């Protein structure tokens, strides 16, 4: 019912990250179940609202669980996928997580692209800290885009630096309304 109300007032896309692989979800989220998440996504889609959904890399998931998450997004027919990378912050439940290495992240992006060849896949939170000088490789190795500016809990690079990177790669700048 709520999804239909959102559709009636003009909502065209709803964001609801699956966060991680279904098999890893109970270890990550304690406020709701994976079934609750699926209920929300299914209702939005049934109401005719497109769904944007992705997750966070670096939550102590296995490589197999990363692949599982990609196939889950494919099963759900998600065409807009943000991939965040955990930036361990002191005072949070994941403060002691070991940061992922840049090449591991880039390989993960390539696997997602292989599994989801037509999806809009982009990276957002944690990319500056985790990819460091290799951020541009993500755009040449599988991602369609990056989120620019600050994120929910941390700041990002300046938009000017990101635009310069895009220009240096000789890519076309396209603002996407999600």
Placement of each model-derived feature along the sequence:
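Conserved non-cysteine loop/helix-boundary elements of the Radical SAM core domain that shape
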Residues: 1-48, 56-77, 92-104
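Short glycine/serine/threonine-biased micro-segments
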Residues: 8, 52, 56, 124, ...
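Short beta-strand segments at enzyme active-site cores
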Residues: 14-16, 50-55, 81-85, 122
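Auxiliary Fe-S-binding modules of radical SAM enzymes
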Residues: 71-178
